[in-house]
Amino acid sequence: MSGPRLLHGTVCVPSIDQALTLYRDVFEQTVVHTGTVGKVEAEAWEAPALTGAKSVVMQPPSGSPVYLRLIEQPDPAGYQPGTHYGWAALELSVKDADAMYTRLLAAGTPIIAAPKALSFTDMLYPMQARGPGGEAIYLNEIRGDLPSSDLPMAKCWVDRLFIAVMGCRDMKASLEFYHALLGTTTGGEWEMPYSVINISFGLDASTAHKLATISDRRTVLFEVDQYPVKSTPRPQAKGGLPQGVAMIGVKVDSLPEGANWVVPPIHRKEAPYLGAMVGVLRGPDGELTELVC
């Protein structure tokens, strides 16, 4: 490996069993580990209340080494999905967005936006849904690469997580933080109407928002969205994690020196780390990011 790559997206949900009906049954992800959150793991996240919480780790049937992890915790008071800073969405590569839309409707999954062709390219055909923890899930039928980036076409019904999306108070500050941390660059910047944000905040459909991508050469890692001024920090229970997309894991060639770790990096045996060194930090809006080496 050369350069940072996504390793996992972790989602906190009120019911593991309910979440599995979407991620395992509808998305057809393979469960590779079922267990509970360990004490060391919970302490690394500053979430001691999650010690013993149910946890499931899944992998796409393609075998791509990018994982989804579910952790069970109750929804906190004041949680309004889509309106808080921090990790907001997971973008997954899918074989057939229209078929996925039909299947999600039949399953009763909340739809944010139906599949829609994009004005600037015919290589992407995305839709968006809302998951059981309030997480936004972008399901993108990739038909080819873009001029500035290589994208993973799905090799199975739902393939790997390929972009993690964050909502932030200050897009520039978030870009600078992650570029300094990961050695990345800004892949592109745009200002456009964004249905996911406008629906969440009750804004007019034509309201434009700034967004940018964080890339390692031709690989996009993150999308960074400038959230409206009325956005709020994500509420979370004492000793718990943020609900919805709680953290993102990034595999790196080496751990950065002098990083402001939540706890010093340690070897972690549990999935999805399997013996790797893992360090945990907080970004500009308090979002948790794990660096894995």
Annotate each predicted stretch with a short phrase.
Residues 2, 11, 34-35, 66-71, ...:
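Vicinal oxygen chelate
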Residues 6-7, 86-89, 161-162, 241-245:
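Eukaryotic phosphotyrosine signaling hubs
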Residues 12-64, 117-120, 166-219:
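Core segments of cupin and vicinal oxygen chelate
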Residues 17-35, 80-87, 99-109, 173-176, ...:
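Extended intrinsically disordered, low-complexity coil regions enriched in Ser, Thr, Gly, Ala
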Residues 39-44, 75-80, 145-150, 195-199, ...:
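A short, acidic/glycine-rich surface segment
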Residues 46-48, 80-83, 154-155, 203, ...:
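Short consensus segments that form the blades of beta-propeller domains
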Residues 57, 77-82, 95:
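Post-signal peptide N-terminal segment of secreted/secretory-pathway proteins
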Residues 61, 65-72, 87:
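Extended catalytic-interface subdomain
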